[in-house]
Amino acid sequence: MRIAQIAPLYEAVPPKLYGGTERVVSYLTEALVELGHDVTLFASGDSVTSARLEAAWPRALRLDPSVRDSMAPHMRLLEQVARVAHEFDVLHFHLDYLPFPLMSRLDTPYVTTLHGRLDLPELQPVFDAFPDSPVVSISNNQRKPLPQAAWAGTVYHGLPDTLLTPQPDVKPEYLAFLGRICPEKRVDTAIRIAAQSGLPLKIAAKVDKADADYFKEVIEPLLDQAHVEFIGEINEAQKPAFLSGAKALLFPIDWPEPFGLVMIEA
Protein backbone atom coordinates (compact mmCIF):
# COMPACT_ATOMS: atom_id res chain seq x y z
CA MET A 1 0.00 0.00 0.00
CA ARG A 2 0.97 3.62 -0.48
CA ILE A 3 0.70 5.02 3.04
CA ALA A 4 1.28 8.54 4.34
CA GLN A 5 2.07 9.06 8.01
CA ILE A 6 1.50 12.67 9.09
CA ALA A 7 3.22 13.54 12.36
CA PRO A 8 3.11 16.63 14.60
CA LEU A 9 5.99 19.02 14.08
CA TYR A 10 6.78 19.66 17.74
CA GLU A 11 9.40 16.91 17.92
CA ALA A 12 11.49 15.04 15.37
CA VAL A 13 10.45 11.51 14.42
CA PRO A 14 11.76 9.81 16.46
CA PRO A 15 12.31 12.50 19.13
CA LYS A 16 15.86 13.34 20.12
CA LEU A 17 14.84 13.11 23.77
CA TYR A 18 11.26 13.15 25.15
CA GLY A 19 8.22 12.69 22.95
CA GLY A 20 5.44 10.13 23.09
CA THR A 21 3.38 10.68 19.94
CA GLU A 22 6.36 11.10 17.65
CA ARG A 23 8.01 7.96 19.00
CA VAL A 24 4.90 5.90 18.32
CA VAL A 25 4.72 7.35 14.81
CA SER A 26 8.33 6.29 14.27
CA TYR A 27 7.73 2.72 15.49
CA LEU A 28 4.67 2.38 13.26
CA THR A 29 6.36 3.90 10.21
CA GLU A 30 9.42 1.68 10.43
CA ALA A 31 7.27 -1.44 10.92
CA LEU A 32 5.17 -0.61 7.85
CA VAL A 33 8.31 -0.13 5.74
CA GLU A 34 9.65 -3.45 6.99
CA LEU A 35 6.40 -5.11 5.91
CA GLY A 36 7.00 -3.86 2.38
CA HIS A 37 4.63 -0.91 2.17
CA ASP A 38 5.49 2.28 0.30
CA VAL A 39 5.49 4.77 3.18
CA THR A 40 5.95 8.53 3.17
CA LEU A 41 6.48 10.35 6.45
CA PHE A 42 5.44 13.99 6.70
CA ALA A 43 7.38 15.39 9.65
CA SER A 44 10.08 17.86 10.66
CA GLY A 45 13.21 17.90 8.53
CA ASP A 46 15.44 16.58 11.33
CA SER A 47 13.47 13.33 11.46
CA VAL A 48 15.23 10.03 10.70
CA THR A 49 13.33 7.28 8.90
CA SER A 50 13.67 4.49 6.39
CA ALA A 51 10.47 5.78 4.77
CA ARG A 52 10.42 8.66 2.29
CA LEU A 53 10.67 11.87 4.33
CA GLU A 54 8.69 14.94 3.32
CA ALA A 55 9.92 17.77 5.52
CA ALA A 56 7.11 20.14 6.44
CA TRP A 57 9.43 22.29 8.56
CA PRO A 58 13.25 22.35 8.76
CA ARG A 59 13.47 21.12 12.35
CA ALA A 60 11.33 20.25 15.34
CA LEU A 61 9.40 23.26 16.61
CA ARG A 62 10.55 22.76 20.19
CA LEU A 63 14.13 23.26 18.99
CA ASP A 64 13.31 26.25 16.79
CA PRO A 65 13.13 29.43 18.90
CA SER A 66 12.20 31.48 15.84
CA VAL A 67 8.71 29.93 15.75
CA ARG A 68 6.21 31.66 18.03
CA ASP A 69 3.00 30.42 16.39
CA SER A 70 3.11 26.63 16.12
CA MET A 71 -0.16 26.55 14.20
CA ALA A 72 1.40 28.21 11.15
CA PRO A 73 3.82 25.35 10.33
CA HIS A 74 0.99 22.86 10.81
CA MET A 75 -1.20 24.74 8.34
CA ARG A 76 1.64 24.51 5.84
CA LEU A 77 1.91 20.79 6.60
CA LEU A 78 -1.78 20.21 5.86
CA GLU A 79 -1.55 22.05 2.56
CA GLN A 80 1.53 20.01 1.65
CA VAL A 81 -0.39 16.80 2.31
CA ALA A 82 -3.50 17.99 0.45
CA ARG A 83 -1.55 18.64 -2.73
CA VAL A 84 -0.39 15.01 -2.97
CA ALA A 85 -3.22 13.22 -1.16
CA HIS A 86 -4.37 11.56 -4.40
CA GLU A 87 -1.04 9.71 -4.63
CA PHE A 88 -1.78 7.58 -1.54
CA ASP A 89 -4.08 4.68 -0.71
CA VAL A 90 -4.54 5.95 2.84
CA LEU A 91 -3.46 8.91 4.96
CA HIS A 92 -2.79 8.33 8.66
CA PHE A 93 -2.89 11.56 10.67
CA HIS A 94 -1.54 12.10 14.19
CA LEU A 95 -2.65 15.75 14.47
CA ASP A 96 -5.79 15.43 16.61
CA TYR A 97 -8.77 17.10 14.88
CA LEU A 98 -6.77 19.47 12.65
CA PRO A 99 -7.20 17.45 9.42
CA PHE A 100 -10.99 17.05 9.72
CA PRO A 101 -12.08 20.12 7.65
CA LEU A 102 -9.56 19.33 4.92
CA MET A 103 -10.04 15.58 4.65
CA SER A 104 -13.83 15.72 4.77
CA ARG A 105 -13.58 17.47 1.39
CA LEU A 106 -11.07 15.11 -0.25
CA ASP A 107 -11.59 11.63 -1.66
CA THR A 108 -8.50 9.83 -0.29
CA PRO A 109 -9.27 7.44 2.59
CA TYR A 110 -7.85 8.64 5.89
CA VAL A 111 -7.83 7.92 9.60
CA THR A 112 -6.69 9.93 12.60
CA THR A 113 -5.18 8.41 15.72
CA LEU A 114 -6.05 10.59 18.70
CA HIS A 115 -3.14 10.73 21.13
CA GLY A 116 -4.42 13.28 23.65
CA ARG A 117 -7.11 13.84 26.25
CA LEU A 118 -10.67 14.00 24.95
CA ASP A 119 -12.62 15.15 28.01
CA LEU A 120 -12.37 18.88 27.26
CA PRO A 121 -15.84 20.44 26.75
CA GLU A 122 -14.76 22.40 23.67
CA LEU A 123 -14.09 19.15 21.80
CA GLN A 124 -17.76 18.14 21.82
CA PRO A 125 -18.92 20.57 19.08
CA VAL A 126 -15.85 19.73 16.97
CA PHE A 127 -16.67 16.04 16.84
CA ASP A 128 -20.37 16.83 16.43
CA ALA A 129 -19.45 18.83 13.33
CA PHE A 130 -17.43 15.97 11.82
CA PRO A 131 -19.41 12.81 12.70
CA ASP A 132 -17.96 10.83 9.79
CA SER A 133 -14.25 11.53 10.32
CA PRO A 134 -12.76 8.12 11.23
CA VAL A 135 -10.68 8.10 14.40
CA VAL A 136 -8.69 5.57 16.41
CA SER A 137 -8.32 5.64 20.19
CA ILE A 138 -5.22 4.49 22.07
CA SER A 139 -7.29 3.07 24.93
CA ASN A 140 -10.98 2.31 25.40
CA ASN A 141 -11.11 4.69 28.35
CA GLN A 142 -9.81 7.57 26.23
CA ARG A 143 -12.86 7.52 23.95
CA LYS A 144 -15.54 7.62 26.67
CA PRO A 145 -16.11 11.42 26.56
CA LEU A 146 -16.85 11.26 22.81
CA PRO A 147 -19.19 8.32 22.15
CA GLN A 148 -20.54 10.12 19.07
CA ALA A 149 -17.18 10.05 17.24
CA ALA A 150 -16.66 7.72 14.27
CA TRP A 151 -14.50 5.22 16.13
CA ALA A 152 -12.72 2.80 13.82
CA GLY A 153 -11.13 0.91 16.70
CA THR A 154 -8.67 1.03 19.58
CA VAL A 155 -4.98 0.41 18.94
CA TYR A 156 -2.89 0.41 22.08
CA HIS A 157 0.61 1.85 21.99
CA GLY A 158 3.42 -0.64 21.74
CA LEU A 159 7.19 -0.75 21.89
CA PRO A 160 9.75 -2.66 19.82
CA ASP A 161 10.54 -5.75 21.87
CA THR A 162 14.28 -5.04 21.72
CA LEU A 163 14.03 -1.36 22.63
CA LEU A 164 14.53 -1.51 26.39
CA THR A 165 16.64 -4.37 27.74
CA PRO A 166 16.61 -4.82 31.54
CA GLN A 167 20.03 -4.59 33.13
CA PRO A 168 20.15 -7.21 35.90
CA ASP A 169 23.58 -6.06 37.06
CA VAL A 170 22.12 -2.70 38.08
CA LYS A 171 20.94 -2.76 41.70
CA PRO A 172 17.56 -1.02 42.18
CA GLU A 173 18.05 1.70 44.78
CA TYR A 174 15.65 4.57 44.10
CA LEU A 175 12.20 5.59 42.92
CA ALA A 176 11.91 6.98 39.40
CA PHE A 177 9.81 9.65 37.73
CA LEU A 178 10.03 9.67 33.94
CA GLY A 179 8.29 11.95 31.47
CA ARG A 180 7.30 15.60 31.44
CA ILE A 181 6.99 18.21 34.16
CA CYS A 182 3.55 19.81 34.09
CA PRO A 183 0.70 20.21 36.59
CA GLU A 184 -1.21 17.09 35.50
CA LYS A 185 1.80 14.76 35.82
CA ARG A 186 2.17 15.70 39.53
CA VAL A 187 5.89 15.37 40.06
CA ASP A 188 5.25 17.24 43.32
CA THR A 189 3.21 14.27 44.48
CA ALA A 190 6.02 11.93 43.46
CA ILE A 191 8.42 13.94 45.62
CA ARG A 192 6.08 13.61 48.62
CA ILE A 193 5.63 9.87 48.06
CA ALA A 194 9.39 9.37 47.96
CA ALA A 195 9.85 11.37 51.16
CA GLN A 196 7.20 9.32 52.97
CA SER A 197 8.73 6.06 51.77
CA GLY A 198 12.24 7.00 52.84
CA LEU A 199 13.63 6.33 49.37
CA PRO A 200 15.53 8.68 47.07
CA LEU A 201 13.79 9.93 43.93
CA LYS A 202 15.39 10.50 40.54
CA ILE A 203 13.45 12.70 38.13
CA ALA A 204 14.15 12.32 34.41
CA ALA A 205 11.80 14.78 32.75
CA LYS A 206 11.61 17.60 30.24
CA VAL A 207 10.26 21.08 30.85
CA ASP A 208 8.36 22.62 27.94
CA LYS A 209 8.30 26.38 27.48
CA ALA A 210 4.60 26.33 28.32
CA ASP A 211 5.41 24.80 31.72
CA ALA A 212 8.53 26.84 32.51
CA ASP A 213 6.75 29.10 35.02
CA TYR A 214 5.14 26.12 36.74
CA PHE A 215 8.53 24.43 37.02
CA LYS A 216 10.22 27.53 38.42
CA GLU A 217 7.48 28.47 40.88
CA VAL A 218 6.21 25.07 42.06
CA ILE A 219 8.70 22.30 41.32
CA GLU A 220 12.14 23.90 41.45
CA PRO A 221 11.85 24.84 45.16
CA LEU A 222 11.13 21.17 45.94
CA LEU A 223 14.32 19.97 44.27
CA ASP A 224 16.50 21.21 47.14
CA GLN A 225 15.44 18.27 49.30
CA ALA A 226 18.19 15.74 49.98
CA HIS A 227 16.24 12.77 48.64
CA VAL A 228 15.53 14.38 45.24
CA GLU A 229 17.79 14.34 42.18
CA PHE A 230 16.67 16.15 39.03
CA ILE A 231 18.36 14.65 35.97
CA GLY A 232 16.45 16.41 33.20
CA GLU A 233 15.57 14.86 29.85
CA ILE A 234 17.06 11.50 28.90
CA ASN A 235 17.14 9.70 25.56
CA GLU A 236 16.29 6.12 24.60
CA ALA A 237 19.83 4.87 25.21
CA GLN A 238 19.74 6.15 28.79
CA LYS A 239 16.39 4.66 29.75
CA PRO A 240 17.40 1.00 30.35
CA ALA A 241 19.89 1.91 33.07
CA PHE A 242 17.58 4.54 34.56
CA LEU A 243 14.59 2.20 34.82
CA SER A 244 16.66 -0.85 35.81
CA GLY A 245 18.07 1.11 38.73
CA ALA A 246 14.62 1.94 40.09
CA LYS A 247 12.69 -0.03 42.68
CA ALA A 248 9.49 1.40 41.23
CA LEU A 249 8.22 4.00 38.78
CA LEU A 250 6.01 6.70 40.26
CA PHE A 251 3.18 7.81 37.97
CA PRO A 252 0.86 9.89 40.20
CA ILE A 253 -1.08 11.57 37.40
CA ASP A 254 -3.93 13.99 38.00
CA TRP A 255 -5.67 13.85 34.61
CA PRO A 256 -7.42 11.30 32.35
CA GLU A 257 -4.29 9.72 30.87
CA PRO A 258 -5.03 8.53 27.31
CA PHE A 259 -2.51 5.70 27.54
CA GLY A 260 0.72 6.24 29.49
CA LEU A 261 3.63 5.05 27.37
CA VAL A 262 6.10 5.34 30.23
CA MET A 263 4.25 2.63 32.16
CA ILE A 264 4.84 -0.02 29.53
CA GLU A 265 8.44 1.16 29.24
CA ALA A 266 8.87 0.49 32.95
Listing of model-derived features with the role each one plays in the protein:
Residues 1-265:
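Catalytic cores of nucleotide-sugar-dependent glycosyltransferases that transfer UDP/GDP/TDP-activated
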